């Protein structure tokens, strides 16, 4: 049985900058970046066998996003969006020799690891068909996570560390949709 406790006191500081640019009705661009620092006042002992850490877990120092929308003709809209998530410290629980003997995961100690950073890019195209005066039928399609920015080192098996998950929530995905507005 594992019990989790809140950590000791902490200091979080940061800055967020955002901006938006538009050219007529054809082009819009919005972007933002957050720079932050999160530290415990005293080193936090998250596992009996791992070194204590002052840096907070799962809090990247840098995060950013952008959205660009282009409307070359009135019924067609093309949107490009991206999210940057900087490297962050994450916990990875130990796998005991007993659990490793089951053959699913090798034995390892509890460690705090720095993740890679991720850039997640997506694109969507939408075309509106207008019916009557106020009904719009939209067809859309796109790709999410074009560059397959996704965690590569998941634990596997019944004794995996189910909390060892970081990065974008979904792998590369293709989608299509229909929207009716009235």
Walk through the language-model features, giving the residues of each.
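Conserved C-terminal beta-signal and adjacent last beta-strands/turns
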Residues: 54-182
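Gram-negative outer-membrane beta-barrel transporters
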Residues: 3-94
């Amino acid at each position: 049985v594992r019990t989790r406790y809140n950590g000791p006191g902490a200091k979080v500081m940061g800055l967020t900058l955002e901006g938006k640019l538009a050219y007529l009705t054809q082009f819009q661009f919005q972007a933002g970046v957050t720079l932050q620092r999160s530290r415990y006042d005293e080193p936090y002992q998250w596992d009996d066998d791992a070194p204590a850490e002052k840096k907070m877990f799962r809090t990247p120092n840098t995060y950013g996003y952008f959205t660009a929308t282009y409307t070359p003709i009135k019924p067609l809209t093309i949107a490009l969006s991206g999210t940057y998530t900087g490297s962050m410290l994450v916990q990875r629980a130990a796998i005991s020799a007993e659990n490793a003997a089951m053959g699913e995961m090798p034995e390892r100690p509890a460690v705090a690891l720095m993740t890679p950073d991720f850039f997640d890019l997506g694109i969507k195209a939408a075309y509106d068909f207008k019916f009557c005066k106020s009904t719009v039928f939209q067809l859309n399609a796109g790709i999410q996570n074009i560059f397959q920015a996704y965690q590569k080192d998941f634990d596997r098996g019944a004794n995996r560390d189910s909390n060892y998950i970081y990065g974008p929530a979904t792998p590369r995905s293709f989608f299509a949709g229909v929207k009716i507005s009235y």
